[in-house]
Swiss-Prot record:
Signal peptide: none
Keyword Nucleus included in the entry's annotation: yes
Protein name: Protein phosphatase 1 regulatory subunit 26
Record's compositionally biased regions (Polar residues): 359-368, 504-516, 705-715
């Protein structure tokens, strides 16, 4: 702004560039730049261009890294997805790779199921964002080229996706490098395990730092060939016994996943790998040396050995489903294959550590130096990460055998020391390809069978479309594993049988492999229980033993067999038996599928072919899965819900049969309905075991007597369970019910609660109808309009008043006298009632018809005793009495304004809000002079000793009492208004000594005033007695009668509040005698009240005049 008036030359015209990029600030003509400045500007521009590209990549990659961190925490064995996706982000951004490639610790795996299905997809979007569209296109083009080019090394990989990936990485790196002037040497490591692949990607400092000349690719190819030759020469030299079998199963699963994933994901991953290769090639071009190439074969062999746990004829066949279009380098592929075969035969592991290759090579430029630092750090981290990541391939968990992990750690130590030469980079590049070729065989070959309960059988090749292993290798693996398992278990299990079943039903294998350990064990226990209880041991045969440690295929197969066997002994299970048994066994299986389907999709080989190294691993995995299971109970997945539907349908089919068989048992349909409606995680967890026991016992009891019934069918036409299958059927049903109750509460307690609730609702509805009928009957009450006609004209203007729900317990016929009548009412009501809509009442005095015998429940009682109120005098209510009794709310009518009684919906809401308080409401309505009806609660509520502060007043009128039994109150006709209802007259808090009418209301929940529109409830003192003092009868001149007495005694508004503090008062009232109202006294009462009202009016008018 300050330069607006300055000449244009003075203003600095800066070129705005992306974040972090320092642009050359050229000051126009008036300023001269030195050559140094110009050269610096160009250099800084180049450097900043690289930095800006890195930052642009970082912006998206940081998001991916954060997401990956979350996914790593949330995902439980989904190492394949994590690694493949991590590689995407890691390749683009090497330094962020550190956080991205962290191995998921065991404690975080429980949550993995939640995101296993979605993690890879979500990360794909991040990786796509990290790679520009141009880069993707370049990658695709390069893939086409690479098919005939470098990818030949990759072609040996287990899956085309991995090989293509590396080729794409190189091409992508070149594409990036083309845009960047400063080449950066990158260190790449072979994907011995996908963990090593992660290492490689971690080390890639940035795609920008790679030079993009095609000569790099050629040089890389040449160096790879040279490396292969050197490797062949040094094979004999690098003979070291390979560590114990450490099948990097996950590596195979990753390629499979990659092939199954979208091409974008592959492209991004490939781009990352290409970048790594380009970095390697750059460094190689800088420093090619045969020495390092010689060293590198050792590293390659070591990595290969670590990956290919042991030389087994099973794993030897390297099946290349898709040579990843990189079939041009046949010589290299052949050399790699030969090397692998020889290595496997010899079981040799070269001593050279792969991390040597990993270390960055020194570059001439600063960018090379920085990238090398970054790489070295990444390499160190990646070394440890690779070690941990390689084993999780085996056991879904980063558990390495001590030897393997130790050797890898040793390898990881000298990471940055020896990687200074370009030959090492060449070795790393070659190791990439070689490791890829080695990977497919490893999952086939080795399965570490723990000495203790064997893990689920390895079936790494069954699920994915990109299977590298041939059928023979799979068969061999299955046979060997089954044989070992049979030896371990000591059970005579025929491996051939299982082999055939597994081979014949790859779908079952895939599904079962998707099951988590918890579900596997659960299904196993269920099956074993069912078989033991339902089938004779001879029928169970080896399947029971087999299921002691259920294997995915075996379990599925055995579950089908179980269903068949359960239905076989008796043809009764046709509709209910099989449908229930199969869902029962499949309940856990399908839940496992629904839960871990996507998860095992991601780490199919890791889960299927992986075997836990020890019982500790198994136990920890089970614990983690149990945690995840609880989480999944809260939100069941599709597979789980389908299984539930199936089970529930089966139960609904079979339940009527059981009920018809044994009518003693109540129908169990309501629990299922409740299970649909109610879902309490805590209750379900607590009730799982109880419901299992209960339902099992009930089902057994229900089905045992039904054994005598004809097994062919019942009157409903549905098959009835026979004795042979009744118990198993009931058992399975009980288990199904238990599973349902695990997700939703279906306890009998819930059913009882629902029934209670329905009963209460019915009671409430009946009470409402009764109250309405009362209102209709009371509408016939005669109106004594003549005696109160003048008064009505002067005092009783029509006032809108709230009609709350009439209390069902108080069916008391009353006469609504004019404002002269004062009633003190304590409506004790413990039931919950809904409020009726607001009504407008024209307040008119009404008389009670003779012969009306009201009925009331024991909760309602009327207060006895009175306090004398002198005319034109104000006696403040006694608030000092009964410190233990609840306090009062005193309201006052503003008699000077026409809006004295805005008793409308808002007021109803206020009453409703107040009605939420605990017990009762004490109400004193009306105003009189020395009236007989000015009442007070004394003995009825509390002991006399506590009422010392109450003024001793003579009873001028009848006492309203009630017996201990609290029977229906019988009120003599023409008695004053004594009705269980609320008659609010006022809208303001009445001050002490105010000349207007005061209305005390007892509520216990309010210690402060609550303004609800025009009503304010004031809690005087929660500890004060419910004694109601005298009402002031003085009113201002303009005060017309604003007292709203319900002209329709039919629907007096009821103000119900509930308070435990009235319990004592209620007990005191129960000690009182029955109400005895004298008819004559009531007549006098009404006449006196009317008289008093007139006198008060006249006196007020005279005073005003």
């Amino acid at each position: 702004m300050f330069l607006v008036n300055a000449p244009p030359l003075a203003s600095f015209q800066t070129k705005w560039a992306p974040f972090g990029q320092t642009t050359a600030c050229r000051i126009p003509v008036s300023f001269s730049e030195s050559e140094e400045d110009i050269s610096r500007a160009t250099i800084s521009t180049q450097v900043q261009g690289i930095i800006s590209t890195l930052q642009s990549d970082e912006s998206s990659l940081e998001v991916t890294v954060e997401h990956e961190g979350i996914m790593q925490k949330t995902r439980k064995g989904d190492f394949n997805i994590e690694r493949g996706l991590k590689t995407n982000a890691a390749v683009l951004k090497g330094h962020t790779r550190e956080s991205a490639t962290l191995v998921v610790p065991a404690e975080f795996r429980d949550n993995k199921d939640d995101h296993s299905e979605f993690g890879p997809l979500m990360l794909e979007s991040d990786s796509d964002d990290s790679v520009d569209r141009d880069i993707e296109e370049a990658i695709q083009e390069y893939l086409k080229k690479k098919d005939t080019g470098e990818a030949s090394n990759e072609g040996l990989n287990t899956t085309s996706s991995t090989s293509v990936e590396h080729g794409v990485l190189l091409n992508d790196a070149q594409n990036f490098a083309a845009a960047n002037t400063c080449p950066v040497s990158m260190v790449t490591t072979s994907d011995i395990c996908n963990s090593f692949r992660l290492k490689e990607q971690q080390r890639s400092s940035s795609p920008v730092s790679v030079s993009s000349d095609d000569s790099f690719e050629q040089s890389i190819k040449a160096e790879i060939e040279q490396f292969l030759n050197d490797k062949k020469q040094q094979k004999s030299k690098s003979k070291i016994s390979s560590p114990p079998k450490v099948p990097c199963i996950e590596t195979q699963s990753k390629p499979k996943l990659k092939t199954s994933k979208t091409s974008e994901k592959q492209n991004s991953k490939q781009a990352g790998s290409e970048l790594l290769r380009k970095h390697a090639s750059d460094s190689k071009l800088l420093r090619p040396s045969p020495e390092t190439t010689k060293i590198q074969p050792k590293a390659c062999v070591l990595k290969q050995n670590t990956k290919t746990s042991s030389p087994s004829p099973k794993s030897t066949p390297i099946v290349k489903e898709e040579p990843s279009d990189s079939s041009s380098d046949d010589g290299i592929e052949e050399a790699i294959q030969l090397y692998q075969l020889e290595k496997r035969r010899q079981g040799i592991t070269p001593t050279v550590t792969p991390e040597k290759v990993k270390s960055p090579t020194s570059a001439n430029s600063l960018t090379h130096f920085e990238s090398r630092k970054r790489k070295s750090l990444n390499n160190k981290l990646a070394a440890s990460q690779d070690i941990s990541n390689c084993q999780p391939l085996l056991s879904k968990r980063p558990v390495l055998s001590e030897e393997d992990s130790f050797s890898k750690r040793e390898i990881g130590a000298p990471t940055t020391c020896r990687a200074e030469t370009a030959a090492e980079l060449m070795c790393a590049e070659a190791i990439l390809d070689i490791s890829k070729t080695i990977l497919p065989s490893q999952p086939q070959s080795t399965y570490v069978i723990p000495t203790e309960p064997p893990p689920p059988p390895p079936e790494p090749q069954c699920d994915s479309d990109s299977l590298v292993d041939s059928d023979d290798s799979i068969e061999q693996e299955i046979r060997t594993f089954l044989a070992r398992k049979a030896q371990v278990e000591g059970a005579g299990i025929s491996p051939v049988k299982l082999e055939t079943t597994i081979e014949t039903s790859p779908e079952l294998g895939s599904q079962s492999s998707k099951l988590s350990l918890t579900h596997k064990r659960k299904a196993k226990a269920m099956q074993s229980d069912l078989m033991r209880k339902t089938l004779p041991l001879d029928k169970l045969g080896s399947n029971v033993e087999l299921n002691q440690y259920p294997q995915p295929d075996e379990r599925l197969q055995s579950s089908g067999k179980f269903a068949a066997k359960l239905s076989a002994p008796s043809e009764i299970h046709m509709g209910a038996g099989e449908s229930i048994v199969i869902p029962e066994v499949s309940t856990a299986l399908n839940r496992g599928r629904g839960r871990s389907h996507g998860l095992t999709r991601s780490y199919s080989s890791g889960d299927k072919s992986s075997s836990l190294d020890s019982d500790e691993d198994l136990d920890t995995a089970i614990k983690d899965l149990l945690k995840s299971k609880r989480k999944y109970k809260k939100r069941p997945k599709d597979g789980k819900s389908q299984c539930k539907k199936r089970v529930r349908f089966d139960e609904t089919i079979s339940k009527p049969v059981e009920i018809s068989e044994d009518s003693k048992q109540p129908p169990k349909d309501p629990p299922f309905i409740k299970s649909c409606l109610l879902n309490s995680s805590t209750a379900k967890e607590n009730s799982l075991e109880k419901s299992k026991k209960r339902r099992e016992e009930k089902a057994v009891e229900r089905n045992i007597p039904s054994c005598s019934s004809s097994p062919q069918g019942n009157k409903d036409g549905q098959p009835m369970p026979a004795c042979a299958s009744n118990e198993p059927n009931s058992k399975t049903r009980a288990l199904d019910d238990a599973h349902e109750s695990s997700s939703v509460d279906s306890d009998d307690g819930i059913e009882q609660e629902i029934r209670k609730f329905l009963a209460e609702r019915a009671k409430v509805s009946s009470a409402l109808t009764a109250a309405q009928n009362e209102a209709v009957s009371d509408s016939n009450i005669e109106k004594n309009t003549q005696t109160l006609k003048q008064e009505q004209a002067v005092l009783l203007n029509p006032v809108p008043e709230t009609a709350l729900q009439p209390e069902p317990c108080a069916n008391i016929s009353t006469a609504a006298t004019a404002q002269a009548s004062v009633v003190q009412l304590l409506a004790l009501h413990s039931g919950k009632q809904s409020l009726l809509p607001v009504r407008l009442f024209n307040t008119r005095p009404v008389e009670v018809r003779t012969g009306m015998s009201p009925q009331s429940t024991p909760n309602c009682f009327i207060i006895k005793k009175e306090c004398l109120v002198e005319q034109n005098s104000i006696i403040k209510p006694i608030e000092q009495c009964l410190p233990t009794a609840p306090g009062r709310v005193i309201t006052q009518a503003n008699l000077n304004s026409p809006q004295n009684f805005p008793v409308a919906g808002n007021f109803v809401a206020g009453l409703k809000y107040v009605s939420g308080t605990e017990k009762q409401l004490l109400l004193n309505v009306g105003h009189t002079g020395p009236s007989k009806l000015a009442t007070e609660i004394c003995k009825s509520m509390v002991h006399n000793s506590r009422l010392a502060n109450c003024p001793p007043l003579d009873r001028k009128g009848p006492a309203l009492e009630r017996s201990k039994e609290l029977p229906a109150i019988s009120i003599i006709p023409k008695s004053p208004l004594v009705r269980s209802g609320l008659y609010l007259l006022t809208t303001k808090v009445c001050k002490e000594n105010s000349p207007s009418l005061c209305l005390p209301i007892n509520t216990t929940a309010y210690k402060t005033g609550i303004n609800l529109m025009s009503i304010q409830y004031c809690q005087v003192n929660t500890q004060k007695p419910p004694c109601v003092g005298e009402l002031s009868v003085n009113q201002p001149k303009s005060a017309e009668s604003r007292v709203s007495v319900p002209g329709h005694a039919t629907n007096p508004p009821l103000f119900v509040t509930r308070s435990r503090e009235f319990k004592a008062a209620r007990e005191g009232v129960e000690r009182e005698g029955r109400t005895n109202l004298n008819k004559a006294a009531s007549h006098d009462l009404v006449a006196d009240s009317v008289k008093k009202v007139k006198e008060i009016k006249n006196s007020q008018e005279s005073k005003n005049v």
